[in-house]
């Protein structure tokens, strides 16, 4: 994001790395030949798969002949999304690294060896010249298999706080790209988050009329987007369902993406609001998030890394509600935007119908404040991260051919 959007190292692996001089100097792009074959390892969640596919598209644009193979599992989103995008997918067993002593921990060595062997076979079959890992279950086996074969490794970390797989990967390579400044990985360089083309190229103002018409909204009314991602967010759904009548009566129209199977009929009447109030449109899933962003003046959402970066790239004011689980990475993902007064952040437990009425409704009706937030957000956004990460891949490939 900052320039200038379904794992076993020691704890010291996320400490700051060696002095900058240990990192190879970037090669001039004219001297950095792109790889002929790349294996992209990552999957499980959209947070890993989306940047993987964005990089794949960028590499293919640069060289239509490059061979690209994604490495994932049969159970992750990649099993559907990668083939749909036209790329080959090789699968390996899913290996979960237990955080506490358990029977699963006793089985880990054998399971990890099987996954590394399967990853190695995929690298050999692809003739991989570079392996790019995005974290998640498949990245650790891919990193270990690549290291054993002396194949250059590139790591991309999406979150402000790195996961275990990428802590391991960063110990094995100097080619480490991060989304956020300050991510504690060795050799880290900020490249941003590779975004899907329809988001990276979005002109919200130019698409606003089309987008609002697509959702059945009024052309000029204040517009709020509420989304908890593809799985939805029960806290957001409950709070906004309870305040739907107030939003509609105040003239604030809403696109509410609830998650599959979590739709509701707002109190205003039909799914698009009552005749007298502003529309309240409830949908389970938005397959055109570019249009949802273009239609909105404000979004209330979780602060996953991909979402934070998409919102910043398109300059959309946001109220972030970090998911209150994991290692707290969602709070850290939004930290830079919060510090710049480009967005608001609220704890999950505070999100209630009363909070929507007292905080979100006045903000949605304050165009001057939203304009200031939009400007601050856009100033921190980055749209060229796919190219920056592809440059890092080219560097690694050139180093491997020296």
Can you name each region flagged by the protein language model?
Residues 369-383:
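A short, well-ordered alpha-helix in the C-terminal region of glycosyltransferases
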Residues 147-209:
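Active-site-proximal region of nucleotide-activated glycan assembly enzymes
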């Amino acid at each position: 994001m900052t320039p200038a959007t379904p794992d076993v190292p020691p704890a010291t692996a996320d400490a700051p790395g060696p002095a900058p001089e240990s990192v190879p100097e970037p090669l001039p792009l004219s001297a950095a030949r792109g790889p002929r074959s790349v294996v992209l390892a990552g999957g499980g969640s959209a947070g890993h798969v989306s940047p993987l596919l964005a990089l794949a598209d960028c590499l293919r644009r640069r060289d239509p002949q490059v061979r690209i193979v994604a490495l994932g599992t049969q159970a992750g989103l990649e099993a559907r999304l990668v083939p749909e995008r036209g790329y080959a997918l090789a699968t390996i067993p899913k290996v979960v690294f237990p955080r506490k002593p358990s029977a699963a921990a006793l089985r880990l060595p054998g399971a990890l060896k099987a996954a590394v062997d399967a990853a190695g076979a995929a690298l050999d079959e692809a003739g991989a010249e570079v392996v790019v890992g995005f974290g998640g279950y498949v990245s650790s086996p891919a990193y270990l298999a690549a290291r054993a074969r002396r194949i250059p490794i590139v790591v991309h970390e999406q979150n402000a706080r790195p996961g275990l797989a990428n802590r391991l990967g960063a110990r094995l390579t100097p080619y480490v790209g991060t989304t956020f400044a300050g991510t504690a990985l060795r050799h880290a360089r900020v490249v941003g988050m590779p975004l899907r083309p329809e988001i990276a190229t979005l002109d919200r103002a130019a698409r606003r009329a089309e987008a609002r018409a697509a959702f059945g909204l009024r052309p000029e009314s204040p517009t709020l987007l509420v989304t908890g991602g593809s799985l939805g967010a029960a806290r957001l759904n409950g709070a906004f369902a309870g305040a739907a009548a107030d939003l509609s009566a105040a003239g604030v129209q809403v696109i509410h993406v609830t998650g599959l199977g979590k739709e509701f009929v707002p109190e205003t009447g039909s799914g698009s609001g009552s005749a007298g109030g502003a529309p309240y449109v409830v949908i389970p899933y938005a397959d055109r998030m570019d249009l949802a962003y273009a239609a909105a003046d404000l979004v209330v959402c979780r602060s996953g890394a991909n979402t934070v970066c998409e919102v910043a790239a398109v300059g959309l004011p946001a109220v972030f509600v970090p998911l209150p689980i994991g290692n707290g990475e969602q709070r850290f993902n939004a930290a830079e935007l919060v510090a710049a007064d480009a967005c608001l952040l609220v704890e999950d437990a505070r999100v209630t119908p009363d909070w929507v009425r007292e905080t979100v409704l006045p903000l949605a009706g304050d165009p001057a404040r939203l304009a200031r937030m939009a400007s601050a957000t856009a100033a921190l956004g980055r749209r060229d991260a796919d190219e920056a990460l592809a440059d890092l891949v080219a560097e690694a490939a050139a180093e491997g051919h020296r």
